[in-house]
Amino acid sequence: MSHFAIVAPPLYSHAVALHALALEMAQRGHRVTFLTGNVASLAEQETERVAFYPLPASVQQAQRNVQQQSNGNLLRLIAAMSSLTDVLCQQLPAILQRLAVDALIVDEMEPAGSLVAEALGLPFISIACALPVNREPGLPLPVMPFHYAEDKRALRRFQVSERIYDALMYPHGQTILRHAQRFGLPERRRLDECLSPLAQISQSVPALDFPRRALPNCFHYVGALRYQPPPQVERSPRSTPRIFASLGTLQGHRLRLFQKIARACASVGAEVTIAHCDGLTPAQADSLYACGATEVVSFVDQPRYVAEANLVITHGGLNTVLDALAAATPVLAVPLSFDQPAVAARLVYNGLGRRVSRFARQQTLADEIAQLLGDETLHQRLATARQQLNDAGGTPRAATLIEQAIAGSESVS
């Protein structure tokens, strides 16, 4: 059996997905050690085979800086990401040698893992907990809000936005380049240039992507990384629609947006449960009842609530969207940051939901909610997407692909 280290950014949703994968690997007899922050609640679940390594103070501070900038200025966030990659590239070699790991499981959003693995001659697997970073001519980057199109104007827009993105990411690219040179590796500057040649595993499925024509043979859609299967809930007919609303763990502080959502749901005669993920004070949470909310909570059993709902209103985080697709529940996306605008664009393209600006008026939001609740044409497309998720294999297939890649030390197609 092998000892794996997991390297990932300090983002809770990524840690949850990777923790599910770690538990699956442990069940198969492997050892897994997390080298990431922001997993306090997960660390409480430490077992004999799933451990959380105490990181040096410099790494912890760099991870806190990324967390603090996740809702702030984009340039400061990029600077924080660059600093984290820098300190990880300095600290990881000694840590990995001390742990005597056999291979790495690396989140695509933290290139330090792949750089250090390659420098040490260790096999590594890339995991896309968000939208995959693989680039393709004719497709917008997975952080851009653009819809799929093939006309010249759209292609030009994709190209220009790619150049702008690369310019903004220049500090991070220079950090990647500097450490690649220091380790004696071929030059690289971008996340997609740091992907594993053995296996690239995505939480997504084709039903939640734009048409792909140039993915490598080692790329695999496996669907949601979950340790427990999605709940099997029969959505009983209701005279009053039930809506579940969440803006994720990083955006749960947006009181005014929650208030607008509550009022919009009430105006169309729907019940709404709002999960703010500890982002609101008790007084702020209570204020949502006066706006029409039926239930306001910090955290819930999200897969079950999503499965029982007639509609999910979300920031467009991939984990929440995958929960909705697993339950064949339509989605209204209100994208806020990161890859959420891109997830929303893919939802709309595949006919699985709609998107609305966070700046939209209450009436506009209510109109979108009413349209989705009354759209019977959604159900077949949602059923197809759910079946695709079920067939993709999920966490067990991801674990099998990792085992195959490590056993043969060659690309798994």
From Swiss-Prot:
GO terms for molecular function: glucosyltransferase activity; UDP-glycosyltransferase activity. It comes from the Bacteria. Pathway: Carotenoid biosynthesis; zeaxanthin diglucoside biosynthesis. The keyword Nucleus does not apply. Keywords: Carotenoid biosynthesis, Glycosyltransferase, Transferase. Gene3D superfamilies: Glycogen Phosphorylase B. Its EC number is 2.4.1.276. PROSITE patterns: UDPGT (PS00375). Signal peptide: none annotated. GO terms for biological process: carotenoid biosynthetic process. InterPro entries: Glyco_trans_28_C (IPR007235), UDP-glycosyltransferase (IPR050271), UDP_glucos_trans (IPR002213), UDP_glycos_trans_CS (IPR035595). It catalyses: all-trans-zeaxanthin + 2 UDP-alpha-D-glucose = zeaxanthin bis(beta-D-glucoside) + 2 UDP + 2 H(+). PANTHER family: EG:EG0003.4 PROTEIN-RELATED, FI06409P-RELATED. Belongs to the UDP-glycosyltransferase family. Catalyzes the glycosylation reaction which converts zeaxanthin to zeaxanthin bis(beta-D-glucoside). The reaction proceeds in two steps with the monoglucoside as an intermediate. This is Zeaxanthin glucosyltransferase.
